[in-house]
């Protein structure tokens, strides 16, 4: 599938793990991996950073963008609308500070993460800060009686979910505070449960509750979510990470709230419980993408099965050509330490090898002591892992999995990626209005970066969701002659690629363009040497 280096002339060749990428078998591929081989020049995986107290200043955000942040995530489980509006303003100020040089400008997307249908405990002894100690083996009564809403203690605990007695059985487990405290149901009443404390500990007020295996019937979109989503539409966010999605109708509900004004906002469904995993296919069809939210998922399903769910979801998203994000505890120890554990390094690399389009940081950048180091570490790990992909096998399988179609763009995308392997192209340049052409090319996972040139700022920002797309925003005025306008944008991409070190004079690039103006007409492929 690859030509020997001697035949390739003096062109810059993406030699990174090339020997391994083009092996015949998986075992051979593993044997050929070489620690002295350089990493991929351009990182293909998107990096999503949660913005919080540790990272919301304009100065820190500028450094995070330089370090590799592509998407800024705002967690609406915390903070007021005023707080988030200020954060969004800071993200945009930091992004636009690079706008003076169109070659080096990096569009950064803003993502709104909804609170979703959570279950929470009441107040401990009427105070938000009070705590009680739950002893292992003790009996704890769970009640729905509102008289105890602010009077919880070590003997009785109020929950805000009225149907809990209908959805749990005797023997069911109830987890509180991210699984730190576990209870087992011993007896059921009409409006109470008697439980035994299996894992004790210190319990504070208003803690999250998980009911693994239970079919929780809370509304997919709460009143708070509706207000938050409307706020997101006003603020022109690029994507919504919808929490606790359990079925396709939940996604439709989010879409309905976003309305006509928010119709271009991408909806990424977070899979966080057993029902979401079970009904994954219908959720995938209704969504623009998926997030593997390993935090709650690791409580809702056994911890040892999380990797299975991750691989299954990433595989199905890759097959469907939809973006997938791997999230939670990616570099958790970097909240307090400047270097990750070896397991975390492997975890991030394996998410990339599995096929994740984006990797996410949560507390590491929101409240950690080393937000910039965490971004840089993900950047370095992702580049190494991308070089180590078994590209030959992956491409063959993606082609086999794609159905026969009269969609011209599908054939163009497949052909251009195959050509990029054959001629060891340094990059693929795609001119795109809606982003669809670039998304289709990304689906076939080329080794080389896809430089997507667009004049639409939102298309550029949302393209970060897809593996391999390096979006660039062309601000030059549209030329009257179509051919001249095409040349202008291709030359702009060439200049960006050279400035970024993706290729140099004499290298080969694949150029995908349309034969006439407008969206949906990409049908011309050229193999071009870099001037």
UniProtKB/Swiss-Prot annotation:
Positions bearing the Glycyl lysine isopeptide (Lys-Gly) (interchain with G-Cter in SUMO2) cross-link: 115, 266, 270
Keyword Ribosomal protein set for record: no
EC numbers, comma separated: 2.7.1.40
Modified residues (N6-succinyllysine): 66, 166, 322, 498
GO biological process: positive regulation of cytoplasmic translation; positive regulation of sprouting angiogenesis
Principal place of residence: cytoplasm
Residues where Phosphothreonine is found: 41, 195
Crosslink feature (Glycyl lysine isopeptide (Lys-Gly) (interchain with G-Cter in SUMO1)) location: 166
Cofactor names: Mg(2+); K(+)
Catalytic activity: pyruvate + ATP = phosphoenolpyruvate + ADP + H(+)
One Pfam assignment: PK
Entry keyword set: Acetylation, Allosteric enzyme, ATP-binding, Cytoplasm, Glycolysis, Isopeptide bond, Kinase, Magnesium, Metal-binding, Methylation, Nucleotide-binding, Phosphoprotein, Potassium, Pyruvate, Transferase, Translation regulation, Ubl conjugation
TM helices/strands, residue ranges: none
N6-acetyllysine modified-residue sites: 62, 89, 166, 266, 270, 305, 322, 475
Positions with a binding annotation for K(+): 75, 77, 113-114
Positions of modified residues (N-acetylserine): 2
Chain positions recorded as beta-D-fructose 1,6-bisphosphate binding sites: 432-437, 482, 489, 516-521
Renumbered residue ranges of the record's region Intersubunit contact: 389-433
Binding, ATP: 75-78, 120, 207
Gene3D superfamilies in UniProt: Phosphoenolpyruvate-binding domains, PK beta-barrel domain-like, Pyruvate kinase, C-terminal domain
Misc: There are 4 isozymes of pyruvate kinase in mammals (L, R, M1, M2) encoded by 2 different genes: PKLR and PKM. The L and R isozymes are generated from the PKLR by differential splicing of RNA; the M1 and M2 forms are produced from the PKM gene by differential splicing. L type is major isozyme in the liver, R is found in red cells, M1 is the main form in muscle, heart and brain, and M2 is found in early fetal tissues as well as in most cancer cells.
PANTHER family for this protein: PYRUVATE KINASE
Protein name: Pyruvate kinase PKM
Record organism: Pongo abelii (Sumatran orangutan)
């Amino acid at each position: 599938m690859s030509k020997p280096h001697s035949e390739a002339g003096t062109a810059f060749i993406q030699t990174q793990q090339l020997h391994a990428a083009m092996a015949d078998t998986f075992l051979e591929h593993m044997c050929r991996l070489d620690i002295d081989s350089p990493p991929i020049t351009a990182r293909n995986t998107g990096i999503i950073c949660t913005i919080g107290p540790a990272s919301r200043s304009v100065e820190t955000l500028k450094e995070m963008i330089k370090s590799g942040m592509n998407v800024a995530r705002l967690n609406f489980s915390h903070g007021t609308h005023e707080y988030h509006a200020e954060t969004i303003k800071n993200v945009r100020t930091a992004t636009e500070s690079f706008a003076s040089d169109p070659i080096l400008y990096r569009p950064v997307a803003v993502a709104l993460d909804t609170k979703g249908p959570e279950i929470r405990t009441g107040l401990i002894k009427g105070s938000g800060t009070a705590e009680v100690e739950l002893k292992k083996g003790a009996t704890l009564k769970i009640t729905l009686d509102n008289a105890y809403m602010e009077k919880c203690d070590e003997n009785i605990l109020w929950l805000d979910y009225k149907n809990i007695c209908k959805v749990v059985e005797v023997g069911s487990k109830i987890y509180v505070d991210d699984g730190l405290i576990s209870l087992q149901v011993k007896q059921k009443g009409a409006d109470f449960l008697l439980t035994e404390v299996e894992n004790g500990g210190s319990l504070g007020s208003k803690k999250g509750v998980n009911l693994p295996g239970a079919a929780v019937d809370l509304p997919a979109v709460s009143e708070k979510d509706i207000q938050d989503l409307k706020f997101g539409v006003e603020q022109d966010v690029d994507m919504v990470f919808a929490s606790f999605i359990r079925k396709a109708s939940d996604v439709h509900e989010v879409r309905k709230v976003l309305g006509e004004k928010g119709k271009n906002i991408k909806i990424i469904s977070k899979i966080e419980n057993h029902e979401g995993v079970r009904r994954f296919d219908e959720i995938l069809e209704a969504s623009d993408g998926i997030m593997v939210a390993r935090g709650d998922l690791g409580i809702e399903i056994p911890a040892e099965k999380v990797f299975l769910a991750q691989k299954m979801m990433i595989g199905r998203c890759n097959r469907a050509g939809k973006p997938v994000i791997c999230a939670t505890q990616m570099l958790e120890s970097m909240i307090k330490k400047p270097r990750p554990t070896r397991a975390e390094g492997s975890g991030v690399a394996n998410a990339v090898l599995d096929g994740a389009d984006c990797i996410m940081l949560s507390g590491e950048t929101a409240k950690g002591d080393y937000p910039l180091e965490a971004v840089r570490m993900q950047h370095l790990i992702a580049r190494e892992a991308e070089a180590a992909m078994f590209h030959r096998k992956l491409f063959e399988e993606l082609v086999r999995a794609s159905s026969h179609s009269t969609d011209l763009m599908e054939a163009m995308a497949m052909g251009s990626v195959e050509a990029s392997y054959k001629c060891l192209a340094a990059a693929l340049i795609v001119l795109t209005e809606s982003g669809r052409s670039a998304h289709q090319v990304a689906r076939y996972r080329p080794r080389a970066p896809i430089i997507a040139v667009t004049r639409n700022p939102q298309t550029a920002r949302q393209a970060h969701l897809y593996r391999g797309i390096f979006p660039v925003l062309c601000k030059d005025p549209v030329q009257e002659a179509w051919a001249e306008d095409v040349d202008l944008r291709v030359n702009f991409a060439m200049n960006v690629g050279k400035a970024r070190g993706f290729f140099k004079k004499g290298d080969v690039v694949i150029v995908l363009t349309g034969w006439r103006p407008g969206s949906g007409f990409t049908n011309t492929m050229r193999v071009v040497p870099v001037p």
